[in-house]
Amino acid sequence: VFESINVADITILIQSGARYKFGDLRIANDTRSQTLAERLAPFKTGDLYQASQLGLLNQRLKQTQYFRHVIVRPLVASSVDAVVPIDVILTHKPRDNFDLGMGVSSDVGPRFTGKWQRPWVNDSGHFAGAQIYVSSPEQYVSFDYKVPLEDAIHNYLSYQAGYQAQNDNDTSSHKWSISASRHWAVENSDWQRSAFLRLEQETFIQGAEPEKSTRLLTPGFTFSRLRSKGGVDINWGDKQTITAEFASE
């Protein structure tokens, strides 16, 4: 204490003890989810323990859309030599999930929407889904299929097929499309990458003109990233997307 200048130096001594480390992931009687969680985990056995990494694993498991509920927690009481096993409790979604909707609006009249998803087509985590929309001026149906590779969020293949019909005043059109895309992420980069190839064929009639058809083969690339600040209580965020397409008729 320096009384002459009213200043005191404070020395704080802290003995935090041994630093905990991550142990194995434990998922009871669920081999396919065990593999999925290990691929998504932002840590490995032996890494220094950080609570934020558990929150990140929890978030990633929810993003896969395989599970209705996710709990990730440390088993401190079961730790040995400061190595803490991680307990993962997962509640799977039903084998098939359906969303149905009906409505009426002044511009299109009655309309119907339907959505189907099957999160686990097989033990490899393939994901299938379909959507349908029906109204007087427009109808469409689409089907998509996702094949996880290194992980189910950032590295996967996806396939889409769809049909759309429109009848707007004096124009009637029918469009079919199929596409395939490869999505991947690069280590130490927050940019998500995808390359795609899309084939579209459209037939349309306008007024009294004869029927016309177009066919487009479109390859392309997309770069996107999602940023946020504030941790769990996000107070800022943005999404940036860059897409380049090249069409050949």
Walk through the language-model features, giving the residues of each.
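A short, amphipathic beta-strand motif
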Residues: 12, 23-29
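N-terminal periplasmic "start-of-domain" segments of outer-membrane beta-barrel proteins
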Residues: 32-46
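Interfacial loop/beta elements and low-complexity acidic/Ser/Thr-rich segments
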Residues: 1, 19-24, 210-212
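Alpha-helix N-cap/helix-start motif at coil-to-helix transitions, marked by capping-box chemistry
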Residues: 28-31, 213
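Extracytoplasmic/secreted envelope proteins and their assembly/folding machinery
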Residues: 24, 34, 38, 51-58
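Post-signal-peptide, soluble extracytosolic/periplasmic N-terminal scaffold domains
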Residues: 1-13
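Conserved "repeat-terminator" motif of extracellular CCP/Sushi domains
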Residues: 10-19, 86-94
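Gram-negative/organellar outer-membrane beta-barrel architecture
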Residues: 47-247
